[in-house]
Each structure stands twice: as structure tokens, then as C-alpha cells.
Amino acid sequence: MKCIAIDLDGTLLNKESVISAENREAIKRAVDAGILVTICTGRATFDVKALLDDLDIPIIAANGGTIHDTGYRLISRTLMDQEAGKAIADYLLSKNIYFEVYTDDHLLSPFDGEAKLHAELDILKSANPNEQTDDLWQGAMTQFKQFGIKPIPHIESVFDGGENIYKLLCFSFDMDKLKQAKEELKHHKKLAQTSSGKHIIEILPASSGKGRALTKLADIYGIETQDIYAIGDSPNDLSMFEVAGHRIAMENAIDELKEKSTFVTKSNDENGVAYFIDQLLSGQYA
């Protein structure tokens, strides 16, 4: 049995954050051919479920924080240490860095989150008048369009209420702030960091990660490493590549993924996932 693990943003989703009909139909063809297809993403499970619509396939979400099988049955979850999470949240608040908290039912964000990012972008534009900021703002708005996002007045209170917390996501246009946050995170041994974009830091439990979750799902189905096909574009897909026998980088992927890949497919705006699946099903990719 083969397994295809597919990232979402920058991979299965196009620049409009939509799954094209071509990609959706290709996944169905792979499933009909007896291949286990799973989504492996940094997004929350409920957000993925809303996007997948009629595709009943396993979901690895929150960078490995949760694994759901077909039928939306929870297989595994890896929770963030509350004390460690609160410590880094306090740091982010002290530096005025926008962040979201991934829980079972919501993506919790600060009540003033959108205004905070808009102020950062205004500063960036003032310092760099020739900077093209429309695409940057569109990237920020993707965060606020996610299913289940819920702005709250005192986001730090989530760490006192007994919520299951899987991940924190930071977003900033201030690269110095992000650099400092990455350095701060190195002191928190119970936490790990990765990224799905230039302006993003994803914070997760040290024992979490896409690669570990993909290995766990493959073990449940009795799938060997050489039969795992991982498709991605960003730094948070590197751990998937480490456990997959076949590593498919998108044309729009970072260079490090392309260097580690066994195949480079078309971009996410050219239905690159569908292109690779068709190559695999037709025998053109061995």
C-alpha cells in the first residue's frame, strides 16, 4: 500500500487558498486506486475539514498535533505544555507580536490582531516606499479567513482555562521581532519551532512535527518508508521529507526542499499535486 501525504498552503491550495477541481479529482483517483491519501498541514483540523468538504481522508493537522483517520476519528494528539506555552505567549505579548493559539475548537487570536498587523505594514511601507505590500497583506488576511478563528480580548487567559493547546502561530512584518522571537524560543526546551512562510513562526511541542505524525499514521496502516510520498513547499515540510521514501517538491518550494526532493512537480497555481498524482498513477513516476 502506498501513502501520499500532502501539505495544504502553497501545495494543494492555490494562491487564493482554494483546492482546484483538478487537484480534488486527482485525490479521488488516487483513493480509488487504493492509495492512502492524507493531508499533512500546519492548519487546524476543523479548518482542514471545512476545506476538504467531500474528501473523507485522514488529516494530520497543527504540524502533527492531531491525527484523525477517515470518518474524522481521532487517532492521536500531542499537547503543548501549558506552562511552556504561557511563558512564550507572555514573551510575544511583551514584544507586541501577533499570534494565534490552536485549540480543539478554535483558532484564538488577539482582539486587536488585524489592527496590529496593519500598523506593522504601515511602518514597513513608510521605511520602504517602493515595497509592494498588496501580496503581503493578502498573506496576512489568509490568517483571518481561516475556519474557526475567534478573536478574544485577553488571549493569555487561554492558558489558565484547561484548554487543549496544540500550537501557536506568530505572524509579523517586523523581521527583527521574528528573529528575536526565534532566539527566545531556543531557551524553551519543551517547544520546537518551524515555519510555513517568511513572516511566520510556528511553535509546537518538542515531541510534535509532521514527520513524526506521518510515521505514526503509516505504521498504523502498515506502510513502509519506501511507499510514502510526501508533497510540500515550506520549511515545515522538511520533517515529512525526512521520513518519506519519495519527496515531491512544488515548483514554488524553498530551495532546501527541492534539493532533497526526488521529483519537482508544477507549482500550486498549476495544479502541481494533480500533475504528480497523474504521473504516479500512469507509471511515469516509478
Swiss-Prot record:
InterPro entries: Cof, HAD-like_sf, HAD-SF_hydro_IIB, HAD_sf. Pathway: Cofactor biosynthesis; riboflavin biosynthesis; 5-amino-6-(D-ribitylamino)uracil from GTP: step 4/4. This is 5-amino-6-(5-phospho-D-ribitylamino)uracil phosphatase YwtE. The active site is at D7 (nucleophile). Catalyzes the dephosphorylation of the riboflavin precursor 5-amino-6-(5-phospho-D-ribitylamino)uracil and of flavin mononucleotide (FMN) in vitro. Also catalyzes the dephosphorylation of phosphorylated 5-6 carbon sugars and monophosphate nucleotides (NMP) in vitro. Mg(2+) binds at D7, D9, D233, S234. Phosphate binds at L8, T41, G42, K210, N236. GO terms for biological process: riboflavin biosynthetic process. The keyword Coiled coil does not apply. It is an enzyme of class 3 (hydrolase). The keyword Hydrolase applies. GO terms for molecular function: 5-amino-6-(5-phosphoribitylamino)uracil phosphatase activity; magnesium ion binding; phosphatase activity. PANTHER family: 5-AMINO-6-(5-PHOSPHO-D-RIBITYLAMINO)URACIL PHOSPHATASE YCSE, PHOSPHOSERINE PHOSPHATASE. Keywords: Hydrolase, Magnesium, Metal-binding, Riboflavin biosynthesis. Belongs to the HAD-like hydrolase superfamily. Cof family. Pfam families: Hydrolase_3. Gene3D superfamilies: 3.30.1240.10, HAD superfamily/HAD-like. Its EC number is 3.1.3.104.
